[in-house]
Amino acid sequence: MIIIKCEDELLMLSGNAYIKAIKLDVPDNDKELTGKLDIYCQEFRKTALSITYDKKVVEKLLNECMTAIEAEMSCAPDCNTNIFIDLKSIIDCAIKKVERGLEND
């Protein structure tokens, strides 16, 4: 398990919940985790995903984020810094999708 730290705490939905980090399942022996990703993982390994919001909303949001991050990583198997540059926009996009989904429920 590794944890990718967001560049800043991202306000989610109602304003009482923040995403501080995203947990990502990657085998510990994966040699493609190099450079900056390794540094981030070591520094923030103990950071928890801290959210105080409806569980179903959180699950939808994380599913959207993880799908986008997995696509990002498959395009950048060397785990370059683009993953970090794009992380905020990935989460912002996921939040918008989840908010639209909530309006349609």
Regions found by a protein language model. Name each.
Residues 1-105:
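Eukaryotic intrinsically disordered, low-complexity regulatory linkers and tails enriched in Ser/Thr/Pro
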